Amino acid sequence: MLVGAGNTWLRLAHVALLAGVLTGCSEAAEGDDSKASARPTATAETSGPRDTAATSGGSIGAAGSACELPVTFDIAKSWTAEAVEAPLSQGPVSLACEIDAKPAGNIGFLRVWAGKSGDADTRAVLEAFLAAEDGVTKEKYRTFASGGVSGVEVEYLYSSELLDETKKESAFAVTTADGPVVVHLGGLDTEEHEEMLPAYELARRTLRTA
C-alpha cells in the first residue's frame, strides 16, 4: 500500500497528462497574451466570481452506482465517475473514487477519499489530510450542514514545485458510521479550480449518508 503517497503520485500523473494537453494547445495560445494576463492570481483573501449552480448529471455513492461510498451526492452533468482500486492513502483516508471533469471541458478531478470507522473528529480528519501533503498554506476552515449531515470545509493554497505556481484548492469532510469521507477539488490552476467549483458545491449541497 502506498501509505502517505496521496496526491503526490496523483499530481505526478496529472502533470504527465497536462504535458500532452498543453503541448497540443500551445499553437493556439501563441499570440494570445491577453488570456494569460487575465488568468486569476491565487490569494487566500479573495475568491473569484462563481458560475451558476451546476446541473446534476446523476448521483453516486449508493449500491450499484459507479462508486459505492458511505455517502451519496450528485455529480455535475457530463462529469464521469470511476471507482479507484489503487491503494493510495493520504493521512487517515484512502482514495475511493475519481470524478473526471474532462468530458465537461475542464482539467481536473473531484476525488473522494474514505477512511475506516472510528471516533475521529471531522476537522481532525481534514487537518490530517492536508498535513500529509507538502505545500499547503493559508487554510481557512468552516463548518457546513447538508441533508442532516454536518461537516467541515477548507479552502487553501497549494504551492506546486512541479508546476512552479500556487493555486487554490478546496475540500470538505464528514464523518459517517462507516468512517470519514473527504471530497477534494484541485485543478490545473486557480482558473480551472474556480470553473469547477459549481460541481464541488453541487456535491456538498446534495450530500447524504448512504
Task: Name each region found by the language model.
Residues 1-13:
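Bacterial N-terminal signal peptides that target proteins for export
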Residues 21-24:
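C-terminal motif of bacterial Sec signal peptides marking the signal peptidase cleavage site
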Residues 26-29:
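Bacterial signal peptide processing site
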Residues 62-121:
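Secretory pathway targeting signatures of secreted, lumenal, and periplasmic proteins
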